[in-house]
Amino acid sequence: MFQFKQFSVKQDKTAMKVGTDGVLLGSWAPVFHNPFSILDIGAGTGIIALMLAQRTHAEQIDALEIDEDAYEQAVENFEASPWGDRLFCFHAGLDEFIEEPEDEYDLIVSNPPFYAEDYKTNDEQRDLARFQDAMPFEEIVEAADLLLSENGILAVIIPFKEEAKFTALAKDFELYPIKITRVKGTPKSEIKRSLLAFSRNEVSEIEIDELVIEIDRHIYTPEYIDLTKEFYLKM
């Protein structure tokens, strides 16, 4: 069990454990527009939806999870939280969910399962299966185009090396970057992740910055502490 300041996350049933990526997106996703409705695509344990329930007054927070174990875990975590009445998890894939869109969302978030090269084995078939498990970015962008409200925002965390590709895809659907934060583990390490926020409205100046997580092992930067202090017990 992973204990945060206002809620806890059980993760015993699922392979999708609480990780830095989810916490980053849940803390970082822009909510300045006071979203009424939020959708979390690929919820895993439900961590991002839970963080957004804490950060906003959104009355409708929907999460989508295709994996049965993860879905059951997310439901359990939602029900145990202080915001159970605002959180709902659908057991469905994105393609199925967008077939009959009923609602528009002011904020759509996704920490998509991506294919990381670190996982390469010598078993080509297994690699291929893993590659197909990754959620195609096209699906996320297409869903956002379909489901975002007029002033809605799409926020994702993806590998830095995929940033240009994702941004180009979003542009095809007339979704434009408004904020980009590039994440490094330590001051000397390479940029690993990109936090990206898109809107239907193009901005003249994109807000771009960099976030370093640790100065040294388990010594967090003031910026990372500031971003996550409402959640982590020891921050």
Swiss-Prot record:
Record-linked InterPro entries: DNA_methylase_N6_adenine_CS (IPR002052), SAM-dependent_MTases_sf (IPR029063), Small_mtfrase_dom (IPR007848), tRNA_Adenine-N(6)_MTase (IPR050210), tRNA_adenine-N6_MeTrfase (IPR022882)
Lineage per the UniProt record: Bacteria, Pseudomonadati, Bacteroidota, Flavobacteriia, Flavobacteriales
Protein EC: 2.1.1.223
Molecular function GO labels: nucleic acid binding; tRNA (adenine-N6)-methyltransferase activity
Subcellular locations according to the entry: Cytoplasm
Pfam families, per database record: MTS
Chief location of this protein within or outside the cell: cytoplasm
GO biological process, one term: methylation
Role noted for this protein: Specifically methylates the adenine in position 37 of tRNA(1)(Val) (anticodon cmo5UAC).
Protein name, entry field: tRNA1(Val) (adenine(37)-N6)-methyltransferase
GO cellular component, one term: cytoplasm
Annotated CDD domains: AdoMet_MTases (cd02440)
